[in-house]
C-alpha cells in the first residue's frame, strides 16, 4: 500500500491531479512533497493538524516532507477563503511567529539529518526584482484563468473586492513550487481544498518553465458532525502551543468529541492502525467513551509528548472519575489502561482549589462555592444553575440551592463539583490541612 492509499483510507484526500501517476510514483520511489504554513500567528492550531499529520504520514512511509513557512507570502496575505483583506503584518512579527511554528512542527516531524526540511519563502521572494519577475514568471499566467479561481472569484464578487497585492499571491505560491522543484526535487504540493487553484497554477508553471510533471493533492475541510470548524470552541481557538492551550485543555478538547466523530478523528489525528480504528465504529456506550479517552491521549501525546499526555489523562481521572480502558480496545495505544494507575495525584493542571478542613467544617453554601471556583459568573447564576438541576457534587445532583458543601462530601480528600455536563472543578483538601 502506497502512502497515497494510506492518506486516502484515513480520510485526508479530497482531490488529486494525475491520480494514477501520483499513486504509481509514490509506490515506486521516495517523493519530496511540501505544504505551506501561514505565519500570521505565533502558534498553529488544531485546524492545521490535517496538513501536519499528512506530512508526518509521508515521512513515516519513506518520503521527504518540506514544511514551507510563508515568511514572504505572509507579508502579502492569502485571499483564499477570506471575504476581506487580511491585516498586513510586519517582517519582525513574521520572524517571531516562524520560530514558534518550527518548534510545534518538530513534535510531529523529524527534521534531523535532512529527513525533513523547514524552509522560509522569504529567502527567495523578498529579493525578487519586479520587472524580471513579471517577464520571467508573470508572462506564463492568464488573468482570464486566474479570476476564475474560487478564491479570486469570491473576493471579486464581495463588497471589498480584491486588492492588487492579494492578486499577486497566486504567482508567488506558484513560484514557491517552481523553486522547490528546481532546488529540492519537490514534485508534490499538498494543501487545503481552498488551495486548489494555487496548486494547479504552480503545476502549470513548473511544466512551462522546467518541462517537468509535478502533482497536487488537496485535503477536505474537516468539520465536526455538528458542522463546526475544527479547533474552535466557545473559549476560542485550540492552539498547539502549550502556553496558549494547556495539555490538559487540549486533552479535554479531544475527549469531548461527538460520538459520530470518534472513529474519523482517530483516523485523522492519531497514528493508530486502521484495522483497530475500524472496530471503534461497532462500539457504543462506555467503550465509546474509552475510545474518546484513547483519542484524547494519543492526540495529546503527539502534540505535547508522552509525559504531558499521561498527566492530562491522570488529571482528567481526578475530575471525571477513573475508568478501566479495555485491553482489546485500540491495543496499539500506550494509554494507561488500569484505573488504579490513573488519577493517583493531582498535578495542578486540572481546574482545582485547595481548602482546609476548617473551611469545610461548618459547610459552605453550594451556590457560593460554585461562584467562588468559577463555575458560575455570579451567585445568582449559581443559584439558578442548582435550581434547574445543573449543579452536582461528586456526580450527585444538588437538590436544593440551600445545600451546604462540607467535609461529609469528601471522597478520598476531594470534592468534585460539576456544572452541567462537562464543566468540573475539584476541591482538594491536603493531608494535615
From Swiss-Prot:
The keyword Protein biosynthesis applies. Disulfide bonds: none annotated. It catalyses: tRNA(Tyr) + L-tyrosine + ATP = L-tyrosyl-tRNA(Tyr) + AMP + diphosphate + H(+). PROSITE patterns: S4. One of its GO terms (biological process) is tyrosyl-tRNA aminoacylation. InterPro entries: aa-tRNA-synth_Ic, Rossmann-like_a/b/a_fold, S4_RNA-bd_sf, SYY-like_C, Tyr-tRNA-ligase, Tyr-tRNA-ligase_bac-type, Tyr-tRNA-ligase_bac_1. L-tyrosine binds at residues 34, 169, 173. GO terms for molecular function: ATP binding; RNA binding; tyrosine-tRNA ligase activity. It is found in: Cytoplasm. ATP binds at residue 232. Keywords: Aminoacyl-tRNA synthetase, ATP-binding, Cytoplasm, Ligase, Nucleotide-binding, Protein biosynthesis, RNA-binding. The keyword tRNA processing does not apply. A motif ('KMSKS' region) lies at residues 229-233. Coiled coil: none annotated. Its EC number is 6.1.1.1. Its main location: cytoplasm. It holds the Pfam family SYY_C-terminal. Catalyzes the attachment of tyrosine to tRNA(Tyr) in a two-step reaction: tyrosine is first activated by ATP to form Tyr-AMP and then transferred to the acceptor end of tRNA(Tyr). PANTHER family: TYROSINE--TRNA LIGASE, MITOCHONDRIAL, TYROSYL-TRNA SYNTHETASE. Homodimer. Belongs to the class-I aminoacyl-tRNA synthetase family. TyrS type 1 subfamily. This is Tyrosine--tRNA ligase. It comes from Desulfosudis oleivorans (strain DSM 6200 / JCM 39069 / Hxd3) (Desulfococcus oleovorans).
Amino acid at each position: 500500500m502506497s502512502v497515497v492509499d494510506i492518506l486516502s483510507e484515513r480520510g485526508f484526500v479530497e482531490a488529486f491531479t494525475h491520480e494514477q501517476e501520483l499513486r504509481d510514483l509514490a509506490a515506486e520511489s521516495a517523493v519530496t512533497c511540501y505544504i505551506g504554513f501561514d505565519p500570521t500567528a505565533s502558534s498553529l492550531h488544531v485546524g492545521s493538524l490535517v496538513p501536519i499529520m499528512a506530512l508526518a504520514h509521508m515521512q513515516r512511509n519513506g518520503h521527504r516532507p518540506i514544511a514551507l513557512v510563508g515568511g514572504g507570502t505572509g507579508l502579502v496575505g492569502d485571499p483564499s477563503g477570506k471575504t476581506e483583506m487580511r491585516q498586513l503584518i510586519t517582517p519582525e512579527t513574521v520572524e517571531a511567529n516562524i520560530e514558534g511554528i518550527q518548534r510545534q512542527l518538530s513534535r510531529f516531524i523529524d527534521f534531523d539529518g535532512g529527513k525533513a526540511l523547514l524552509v522560509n519563502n522569504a529567502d527567495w521572494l523578498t529579493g525578487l526584482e519586479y520587472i524580471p519577475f513579471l517577464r520571467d514568471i508573470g508572462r506564463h499566467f492568464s488573468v482570464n484563468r486566474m479570476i476564475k479561481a474560487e478564491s479570486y472569484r469570491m473576493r471579486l464578487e464581495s463588497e471589498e473586492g480584491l486588492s492588487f497585492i492579494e492578486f499577486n499571491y497566486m504567482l508567488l505560491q506558484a513560484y514557491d513550487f517552481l523553486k522547490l522543484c528546481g532546488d529540492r526535487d519537490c514534485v508534490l504540493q499538498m494543501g487545503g481544498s481552498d488551495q486548489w487553484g494555487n496548486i494547479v497554477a504552480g503545476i502549470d508553471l513548473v511544466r512551462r518553465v522546467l518541462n517537468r510533471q509535478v502533482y497536487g493533492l488537496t485535503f477536505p475541510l474537516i468539520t465536526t458532525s455538528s458542522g463546526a470548524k475544527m479547533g474552535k470552541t466557545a473559549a476560542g481557538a485550540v492552539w498547539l502551543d502549550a502556553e496558549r492551550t494547556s495539555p490538559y485543555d487540549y486533552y479535554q478538547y479531544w475527549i469531548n468529541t461527538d460520538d459520530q466523530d470518534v472513529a474519523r478523528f482517530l483516523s485523522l489525528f492519531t497514528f493508530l492502525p486502521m484495522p483497530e480504528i475500524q472496530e471503534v465504529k461497532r462500539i457504543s456506550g462506555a467503550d465509546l467513551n474509552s475510545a474518546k479517552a484513547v483519542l484524547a491521549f494519543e492526540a495529546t501525546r503527539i502534540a505535547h509528548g508522552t509525559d504531558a499526555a499521561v498527566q492530562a489523562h491522570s488529571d482528567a481521572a481526578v475530575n471525571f472519575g477513573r475508568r478501566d480502558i479495555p485491553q482489546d480496545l485500540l491495543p496499539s495505544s500506550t494509554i494507561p489502561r488500569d484505573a488504579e494507575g490513573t488519577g493517583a495525584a493531582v498535578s495542578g493542571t486540572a481546574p482545582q482549589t485547595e481548602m482546609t478542613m476548617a473551611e469545610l467544617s461548618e459547610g459552605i453554601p453550594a451556590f457560593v462555592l460554585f461562584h467562588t471556583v468559577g463555575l458560575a459568573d455570579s451567585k445568582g447564576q449559581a443559584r439558578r444553575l442548582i435550581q434547574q438541576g445543573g449543579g452536582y457534587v461528586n456526580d450527585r445532583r444538588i437538590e436544593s440551592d440551600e445545600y451546604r458543601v462540607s467535609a461529609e462530601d469528601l471522597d478520598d480528600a476531594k470534592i468534585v463539583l460539576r456544572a452541567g455536563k462537562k464543566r468540573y472543578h475539584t476541591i482538594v483538601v491536603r493531608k494535615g490541612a
